Amino acid sequence: MPFYVLKLGGSLIGSANALMSALLNLSREDYCFLVIPGGGPMADLVRGLYDKGLLSDEAAHWMAILAMEQYAYLLADGTGAVLTTEISRSDGVKVLLPYRALQEDDTGMEHSWDYTSDSVAVLIASRLNSNLIKATDVDGIIIEGEVRKVVSATLLKGIRTCLDQGSIRLLKDRTC
């Protein structure tokens, strides 16, 4: 059965139910997904507090991870998707609650805004030796105003895009 780690960006919060429904339909055809939620507007609130100097890097990191958990509950709510705290390959559609797993082992991740939910998804896909799909409201990666479908992680290093710098460091020489 094909298995994918799917990072579902917070920018898609308005389409969450339709997207989860589509994933559940695909799971009936033996596709399996571990959905990694973005932080969405909840993480934006954390970033706003951080930008005002009200939070340390450490507190902001863990609060942003908890924001991902809030989005996970929204994604699973009424859709039939199952919430999980386990980082593992499994059948169907599971939505990860990442806090506990990352508290146990977040090796490779700095506690800074360079490492967001994108980095969490890359880290988990690497641990599971899985393909990673990053779903956002942008169809590709925007570099200097141009949408590119495929780029190397090396090209992205140091460029501000819709992919965080931590992900780029974790990807190293892979193609994304």
Locate each region found by the language model.
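N-terminal glycine-/serine-/threonine-rich phosphate-binding loop
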Residues: M1-L34
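Short beta-strand segments
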Residues: K7-G9, I36-P37, L97-P98, A135
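Active-site phosphate/oxyanion-binding loops
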Residues: D51-K52, E86, D91-I124, N129-C176
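Ordered, amphipathic secondary-structure segments that act as subunit-interaction surfaces
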Residues: I65-R89
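A charged helix-plus-loop insertion that forms the helical arch/lid used to bind
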Residues: R47-A67
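Short beta-strand segments at enzyme active-site cores
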Residues: L34-L45, I133-D137
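Short, active-site-adjacent cap segments at secondary-structure transitions
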Residues: L12-G14, P41-D44, L102-Q103, D139-I142
